[in-house]
Amino acid sequence: NKKTFLNINSSIKKVEKKIGFKISNNQKTIEYSPLALEYLKNISKKISDKKGALLIIDYGYLEDSMKDTLMAIKKHTISNLFKEFKNSDITYKLNFKLLKKITNILKLKCQGITTQRNFLLNLGIQQRAEIISRNLPFSRKADIYYRLKRLIDKNQMGELFKVMLITDKRINFNLGF
């Protein structure tokens, strides 16, 4: 019962037809989730029908060119994908620029894309931490600030995670962006 990974070669034309726009010929890697694209199409209908929104917070990147980001995570650490795949979370980083292009094709509006750090700082997370920790013992304050640092530090989740707000075209909302 040996498990293997398959590298499925697909025609760029097929991928372009699925995502709805032409991909640069200079791309060495095309990484996207067809299932995620289907989910986004279904969600977009609900967003349009209900004048709703979708807030995405995930690790990803903002560059135009696609990257090979497939990885395995075990106990909060990147592990060897081929040796640890049974005991790891297999994941990849979202290409937020690709997601924005798809959002436009689906006739939705991207209200903003930013880092988790900027989003939380713009929403006043530091002031909130000060308020809730004001009368707490030192150990509880330290815990709050330790967790805050993890969320907004550039070397931790602050820059790795991105935040994107997708809404119906009739909505204007930029809080946090």
Task: Annotate each PLM feature.
Residues 1-11, 17-19:
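Short phosphate-coordinating micro-motif centered on Lys-Gly-acidic
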Residues 15-177:
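Long, Lys/Arg- and hydrophobic-enriched amphipathic alpha-helices
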